[in-house]
């Protein structure tokens, strides 16, 4: 599970970059153990801003970030959408 501080940082940057929504998934949402990284799915960010968004999250969050662009259709992205937890949007 991620900290409230990390969640607030994610929400702050989601607003800054005007994303449609953010989904946490993987170890980021499991309560039984501490996550080694923060798994984030994002939809609605402009492609030219994706890596800037990623860099800011990587800089300010307490753990490494895995960022997935959910605007691309794939089985993995469908799984993230079905099993993850939406925290904004």
Regions found by a protein language model. Name each.
Residues 1-23, 29-35, 44-89:
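Catalytic core of pol beta-like nucleotidyltransferases
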